[in-house]
């Protein structure tokens, strides 16, 4: 599954990202977007990041590298 970060860069499973609010970096483990439109997906807490607790909204992420 693919969505877009706060700068409209494509992000998908395996992408290296930074959480804009706290500067923590990690790799996307999963994007849970079943049954959501692209717009709903971009605004929902649906991204799991390796080494971080919880799910994050794509608008709170900044892509650092694309696998």
Identify the function of each model-found stretch.
Residues 1-13:
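Mixed-charge, Lys/Arg-rich low-complexity intrinsically disordered regions
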Residues 16-59:
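Basic/aromatic-rich interaction segments and small domains that mediate binding to polyanionic partners
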Residues 63-67:
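Short hydrophobic/aromatic patches at helix-to-coil boundaries
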């Amino acid at each position: 599954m693919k969505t877009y970060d706060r700068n409209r860069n494509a992000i998908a499973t395996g992408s290296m990202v930074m959480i804009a609010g706290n500067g923590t970096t990690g790799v996307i483990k999963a994007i849970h977007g079943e049954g959501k439109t692209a717009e709903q997906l971009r605004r929902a807490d649906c991204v799991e990041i390796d080494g971080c607790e919880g799910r994050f909204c794509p608008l709170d992420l900044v892509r650092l590298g694309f696998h």
